[in-house]
């Protein structure tokens, strides 16, 4: 929204001569920093009030898994739905600092709010029923897929229209380590993109099981994709690195700046012992947001590297469930895999910090693919 002030100075001589500082709003880097600080400030200021309100309204808070580690029972009574704080920071900050005429920004916010609403309803059912069983799995996935498909459709059409006539770039998948090889999926790209976004949302959701475990890797992924979005949206940098130039995606760096700021604010309250959990409200929204940016920038496969920790968590659940159905035995002591390490004797802080380290290493590997071609 603030970028419009800079555009206003192009048409009104008074603004262009007396308010030259408005030109700062043209720069993505400046607005990214502004979005970061704004979202962090929003969460810091309103976080305590939101936590107090949720604690009163929820009573017993988020239910604790009966088969989980014994150390988790001391967390009983901790309120959930802390994702509301994160969403408030991201959305308000993005509305202020991002270009709302940008299709990629609108699509990303659509997925973020849509997935956040689904997660909120899931959290609401869990709290009111005092059960870890919330929204019907199939219904939830169906709604997520519809929202994601709508976003991907509009992003794909935007990419197709911004390219040369006859270009299939918008409906194609790019591969790391290859300069020009792309696989055109046609309209099936909508299904592929939606699958990526839904998978990302649920992978982050599965990771959110310990204090601070999910939010820091999310910020690491957001920072990584902030760099990717900025480079992919800049022709000079994209040409130099031989990555796909996607006009308009640089604006997503502003939204990702808001994610980092909101994440920092939330971590202040989520640091162990957590005063609040983000719940599905936050984890689904954040994962969906990262997935949408990956699809927009044509770095879906790179996301599997940068977000490898989330992939590992999701795979551990898939393997555990699948193997148990076939053999009635378990591969892990408990899934997702962070609980497996708790059962092995790692303290919660050891699991969290070591997983953070893994997330940093994977992000560095993922970013290195931008140059290794």
Curated annotation (Swiss-Prot):
<protein>
    <recommendedName>
        <fullName>Phospho-N-acetylmuramoyl-pentapeptide-transferase</fullName>
        <ecNumber>2.7.8.13</ecNumber>
    </recommendedName>
</protein>
<feature type="transmembrane region" description="Helical">
    <location>
        <begin position="301"/>
        <end position="321"/>
    </location>
</feature>
<keyword id="KW-0472">Membrane</keyword>
<keyword id="KW-0133">Cell shape</keyword>
<feature type="transmembrane region" description="Helical">
    <location>
        <begin position="275"/>
        <end position="295"/>
    </location>
</feature>
<dbReference type="GO" id="GO:0051992">
    <property type="term" value="F:UDP-N-acetylmuramoyl-L-alanyl-D-glutamyl-meso-2,6-diaminopimelyl-D-alanyl-D-alanine:undecaprenyl-phosphate transferase activity"/>
</dbReference>
<keyword id="KW-0131">Cell cycle</keyword>
<feature type="transmembrane region" description="Helical">
    <location>
        <begin position="100"/>
        <end position="120"/>
    </location>
</feature>
<feature type="transmembrane region" description="Helical">
    <location>
        <begin position="252"/>
        <end position="272"/>
    </location>
</feature>
<dbReference type="InterPro" id="IPR003524">
    <property type="entry name" value="PNAcMuramoyl-5peptid_Trfase"/>
</dbReference>
<dbReference type="GO" id="GO:0008963">
    <property type="term" value="F:phospho-N-acetylmuramoyl-pentapeptide-transferase activity"/>
</dbReference>
<keyword id="KW-1133">Transmembrane helix</keyword>
<keyword id="KW-1003">Cell membrane</keyword>
<keyword id="KW-0573">Peptidoglycan synthesis</keyword>
<dbReference type="GO" id="GO:0051301">
    <property type="term" value="P:cell division"/>
</dbReference>
<dbReference type="GO" id="GO:0071555">
    <property type="term" value="P:cell wall organization"/>
</dbReference>
<dbReference type="Pfam" id="PF10555">
    <property type="entry name" value="MraY_sig1"/>
</dbReference>
<feature type="transmembrane region" description="Helical">
    <location>
        <begin position="78"/>
        <end position="98"/>
    </location>
</feature>
<dbReference type="GO" id="GO:0008360">
    <property type="term" value="P:regulation of cell shape"/>
</dbReference>
<keyword id="KW-0808">Transferase</keyword>
<comment type="similarity">
    <text>Belongs to the glycosyltransferase 4 family. MraY subfamily.</text>
</comment>
<keyword id="KW-0997">Cell inner membrane</keyword>
<feature type="transmembrane region" description="Helical">
    <location>
        <begin position="141"/>
        <end position="161"/>
    </location>
</feature>
<keyword id="KW-0132">Cell division</keyword>
<dbReference type="GO" id="GO:0046872">
    <property type="term" value="F:metal ion binding"/>
</dbReference>
<dbReference type="InterPro" id="IPR018480">
    <property type="entry name" value="PNAcMuramoyl-5peptid_Trfase_CS"/>
</dbReference>
<dbReference type="InterPro" id="IPR000715">
    <property type="entry name" value="Glycosyl_transferase_4"/>
</dbReference>
<keyword id="KW-0812">Transmembrane</keyword>
<dbReference type="GO" id="GO:0009252">
    <property type="term" value="P:peptidoglycan biosynthetic process"/>
</dbReference>
<keyword id="KW-0460">Magnesium</keyword>
<keyword id="KW-0961">Cell wall biogenesis/degradation</keyword>
<comment type="function">
    <text>Catalyzes the initial step of the lipid cycle reactions in the biosynthesis of the cell wall peptidoglycan: transfers peptidoglycan precursor phospho-MurNAc-pentapeptide from UDP-MurNAc-pentapeptide onto the lipid carrier undecaprenyl phosphate, yielding undecaprenyl-pyrophosphoryl-MurNAc-pentapeptide, known as lipid I.</text>
</comment>
<comment type="pathway">
    <text>Cell wall biogenesis; peptidoglycan biosynthesis.</text>
</comment>
<feature type="transmembrane region" description="Helical">
    <location>
        <begin position="34"/>
        <end position="54"/>
    </location>
</feature>
<keyword id="KW-0479">Metal-binding</keyword>
<feature type="transmembrane region" description="Helical">
    <location>
        <begin position="181"/>
        <end position="201"/>
    </location>
</feature>
<feature type="transmembrane region" description="Helical">
    <location>
        <begin position="350"/>
        <end position="370"/>
    </location>
</feature>
<dbReference type="Pfam" id="PF00953">
    <property type="entry name" value="Glycos_transf_4"/>
</dbReference>
<feature type="transmembrane region" description="Helical">
    <location>
        <begin position="212"/>
        <end position="232"/>
    </location>
</feature>
<dbReference type="GO" id="GO:0005886">
    <property type="term" value="C:plasma membrane"/>
</dbReference>
């Amino acid at each position: 929204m603030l970028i419009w002030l800079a555009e206003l100075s192009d048409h009104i001589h008074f603004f262009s001569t007396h308010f030259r500082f408005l030109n700062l709003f043209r720069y993505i880097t400046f607005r990214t920093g502004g979005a970061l600080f704004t979202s962090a400030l929003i969460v810091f200021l309103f976080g305590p009030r939101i936590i107090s309100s949720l604690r009163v309204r929820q009573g017993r808070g988020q239910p604790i898994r009966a088969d989980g580690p014994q150390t988790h029972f001391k967390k009983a009574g901790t309120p959930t739905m802390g994702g509301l704080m994160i969403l408030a920071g991201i959305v308000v900050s993005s509305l202020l600092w991002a270009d709302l005429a940008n299709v990629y920004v609108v699509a990303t916010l659509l997925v973020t709010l849509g997935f956040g609403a689904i997660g909120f309803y899931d959290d609401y059912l869990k709290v009111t029923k005092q059960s870890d069983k919330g929204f019907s799995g199939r219904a939830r996935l169906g709604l997520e897929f519809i929202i994601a498909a709508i976003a991907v459709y509009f992003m794909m059409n935007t990419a197709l229209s911004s390219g040369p006539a006859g270009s299939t770039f918008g409906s194609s998948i790019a591969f790391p380590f290859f300069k020009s090889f792309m696989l055109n999926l046609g309209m099936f790209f909508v299904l592929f993109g939606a699958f990526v976004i839904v998978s990302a949302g649920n992978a982050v959701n599965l990771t959110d099981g310990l204090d601070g475990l999910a939010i820091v890797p999310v910020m690491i992924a957001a920072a990584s994709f902030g760099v990717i979005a900025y480079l992919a949206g800049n022709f000079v940098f994209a040409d130099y690195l031989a990555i796909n130039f996607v006009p308009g995606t640089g604006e997503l760096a502003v939204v990702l700046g808001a994610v980092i700021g909101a994440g920092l604010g939330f971590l202040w309250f989520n640091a162990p012992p957590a005063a609040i959990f983000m719940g599905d409200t936050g984890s689904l929204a954040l994962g969906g947001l990262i997935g949408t940016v990956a699809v927009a920038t044509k770095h879906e496969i790179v996301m599997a590297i940068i977000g490898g920790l989330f992939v590992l968590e999701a795979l551990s659940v898939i393997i555990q469930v699948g193997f148990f159905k076939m053999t009635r035995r378990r591969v892990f002591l408990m899934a997702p895999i962070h609980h497996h390490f708790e059962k092995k004797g790692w303290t919660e802080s050891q699991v969290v910090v070591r997983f953070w380290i893994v997330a940093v290493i994977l992000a560095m590997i993922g970013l290195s693919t931008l140059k290794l071609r």
